[in-house]
Swiss-Prot record:
This is Probable fibrosin-1. Residues 248-272, 288-311 have a biased composition (Basic and acidic residues). Residues 40-79, 205-311, 406-460 are annotated as: Disordered. It comes from Homo sapiens. It comes from the Eukaryota. There is a cross-link at K8 (Glycyl lysine isopeptide (Lys-Gly) (interchain with G-Cter in SUMO2)). The modification Phosphoserine is found at S281. InterPro entries: AUTS2. Residues 212-223, 436-453 have a biased composition (Pro residues). The lineage of its organism: Eukaryota, Metazoa, Chordata, Craniata, Vertebrata. Keywords: Isopeptide bond, Methylation, Phosphoprotein, Ubl conjugation. Pfam families: Auts2 (PF15336). The modification Asymmetric dimethylarginine is found at R229, R239.
């Protein structure tokens, strides 16, 4: 069957990464197939060797010999034949077939070859439970179902590795259990106890630090054991017992939460008293709508309020005294300096109280100012009486004669330059008058005398 593959595939099957082969079944030599009959499959995996004296070699080919044989013939030793194709994989497959045949003889009514082959696979994952345990779910969740792997003759022992896997330094020397013993440690039946936080100390999925765990059921420390150490459920939050609670613990929490809010309310109430309001007279403080009256909570606040009231009263008295002194110094003639022009309301609307406020003052009513005549921009002369005054008033109202409007009546304009300096435009030079050509005047053409009226023509 394997003859159709090329020779390069032989190195794949011949290479053996393991140094030694522990015996799979007690009593059999390591590295050799079991000396039993293979039935109809006997010739499938037997080596194809023509020399009966040369036993088939197992494992890697010696370094001194090549797989294809030596190219130089040697007459002193028999020629090397092509070695057999037995390797570790052949032995493993043949052994698995043998076990399956023996199992089918005892349990002929069950056909489950897949579950039988899985426990025998070598590797760090260990063995899986056979089909007998998986077919009975009651044995998985009860304490009676957690039997030792040695009870099954076709399952490897917990303390033994695969038949072709030797123990090394990086692999845990302790075996892995083949049954789901952790499910038997649950408090309730089936999956109802998955939420229980209590696990058996000897279970496979229990913690490493759990006391009383036997070595065979302890969690392995190798990195592959992380898959087995993970719990089946997430750890649930454990509510503290009633004894751990104190009767006053629940009542203290609302008080602690209320303290910041009370402090904030006090700060909001004290805020108007700590900062002065803008655009508000200190003598007449106004309270905001919905705000309580003055509530002095501390002695410092009271002292500040008293000082503010005293300062406001002193400022009002000083302002009144300054106004009276200014009115006495200026007198009734300078009262217009004290009264500022009232500002008009928005959009120049009517506001008689604001405009008449200055005239209703007591000082204005007591001594009103004297109305002064408007200033004159000309000197006052003697007033004329009689008919001459009317003519003078008429002439005074007329506009003076402008030289540009009346050029004939206007005197000649003065020279632009000084009188001592010669002016170029004052007179025409004589050379220009003598050298100028005479004006060209066309002579009139002689015209024929006009005709008199003659007889009318017939054709017209």
């Amino acid at each position: 069957m394997f003859e159709k593959y090329p020779g390069k595939m032989e190195g794949l099957f011949r290479h053996n990464p393991y140094t030694a082969f522990p015996p799979a079944v007690p009593g059999l030599p390591p590295g050799l197939p079991p000396a039993v009959s293979f039935g109809s499959l006997q010739g499938a995996f037997q080596p194809k060797s023509t020399n009966p004296e040369l036993p088939p070699r197992l494992g890697p080919v010696p370094s001194g010999l090549s797989q294809k044989g030596t190219q130089i013939p040697d007459h002193f030793r028999p020629p090397l034949r092509k070695p057999g194709k037995w390797c570790a994989m052949h032995v493993r497959v043949a052994y698995m077939i043998l076990r399956h045949q023996e199992k089918m003889k005892g349990d002929s009514h069950k056909l489950d070859f897949r579950n039988d082959l899985l426990p025998c696979l070598p590797g760090p994952y260990g063995a899986l439970p056979p089909g007998q345990e998986l077919s009975h779910p009651a044995s998985l969740f009860t304490a009676t179902g957690a039997v030792h792997a040695a009870a099954n003759p076709f399952t490897a022992a917990p303390g033994a590795h695969g038949p072709f896997l030797s123990p090394s330094t990086h692999i845990d020397p302790f075996g892995r259990p083949t049954s789901f013993a952790s499910l038997a440690a649950l408090s309730n039946g089936a999956f109802g106890g998955l939420g229980s936080p209590t696990f058996n100390s000897g279970a496979v999925f229990a913690q490493k630090e759990s006391p009383g765990a036997p070595p065979a059921f302890a969690s392995p420390p190798d990195p592959w054991g992380r898959l087995h150490r993970s719990p089946l459920t997430f750890p649930a939050w454990v509510r503290p017992p009633e004894a751990a609670r104190t009767p006053g613990s629940d009542k203290e929490r609302p008080v602690e939460r209320r303290e910041p809010s009370i402090t904030k309310e006090e700060k909001d109430r004290d805020l108007p008293f700590s900062r002065p309001q803008l655009r508000v007279s200190p003598a007449t403080p106004k309270a905001r709508a919905g705000e309580e009256g003055p509530r002095p909570t501390k002695e410092s606040v009271r002292v500040k309020e008293e000082r503010k009231e005293e300062a406001a009263a002193a400022a009002a008295a000083a302002a009144a005294a300054a106004a009276a002194a200014a009115a006495a110094a200026t007198g009734p003639q300078g009262l217009h300096l004290l009264f500022e022009r009232p500002r008009p309301p928005p959009f120049l609307g009517p506001s008689p109280p604001d405009r008449c406020a200055g005239f209703l003052e007591p000082t204005w009513l007591a001594a009103p100012p004297r109305l002064a005549r408007p200033p004159r921009f000309y000197e006052a002369g003697e007033e004329l009486t009689g008919p001459g005054a009317v003519a003078a008033a008429r002439l005074y109202g007329l506009e003076p004669a402008h030289p540009l409007l009346y050029s004939r009546l206007a005197p000649p304009p003065p020279p632009a330059a000084a009188p001592g300096t010669p002016h170029l435009l004052s007179k025409t030079p004589p050379g220009a008058l003598l050298g100028a050509p005479p004006p060209l005047v066309p002579a009139p053409r002689p015209s024929s005398p006009p005709r008199g009226p003659g007889p009318a023509r017939a054709d017209r």
